[in-house]
Regions:
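Mitochondrial intermembrane space
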Residues: 1-183
Length: 183
């Protein structure tokens, strides 16, 4: 498996050399012209950077931009709201947490208190490390994750600073593992 190409290799504009592409990427808010991921940029900021590059006349060399794949993002140009809402293929994030004494409103309040920027789609506006810290806060608050433990960020690489080598009681924190293909 080949590593992904550097970010600057995915953009082109007539008369602009590689250094010009790198400078434009940094000018459009990308933290690096080579490689970015969820630990360095949010989904919305990535989409905003792509829109900036397109606005400067650069052409994206891959098949689809981030907004093509994620039209619901606030940074993406206005689209048909129904189509954008239909592009989500999973329930809102607040449905991923439960506690016997907490209704949906209390879950959402706890999520906000734990630092979630959104109770619907936190990945749009939060870095992975911040989501991991919020997940740990929810577990500390006695909430159970309704997805398998493997979906917790502190159970998957990359090692995030927020995880602090914490051991999570996977037998009690989360829903049981699912068989392949099971929803």
């Amino acid at each position: 498996m080949q590593p992904p190409p550097p970010l600057y290799a995915l953009w082109a504009k007539a008369g602009v050399d590689q250094q010009g592409v790198r400078d434009a990427l940094l000018g459009c808010g990308f933290p690096s012209a080579s490689h970015v991921d969820g630990t360095t940029i949010t989904n919305n900021d990535y989409a905003r950077g792509e829109q900036c590059m397109l606005g400067k006349g650069f052409a994206y060399q891959e098949r689809h931009t981030y907004c093509d794949a994620h039209p619901h993002l606030a940074a993406c140009p206005a689209t048909d709201g129904a189509a954008a809402a239909g592009s989500r293929q999973h329930p809102p994030a607040y449905e991923q947490w439960t506690r016997p004494d907490a209704d949906a409103q209390r879950v959402q309040q706890a999520m906000r208190a734990c630092g979630y920027a959104s109770v619907i789609e936190p990945g749009d506006d939060m870095l992975l490390n911040d989501i991991a810290a919020a997940q740990l806060c929810m577990l500390d608050g006695g909430f159970q994750f309704t997805l398998p433990a493997s979906a917790l960020l502190c159970r998957n690489p990359p090692k995030l600073a927020a995880c602090r080598d914490r051991v999570i009681d996977t037998a009690h924190c989360c829903a049981p593992p699912r068989a392949a293909g099971q929803r």
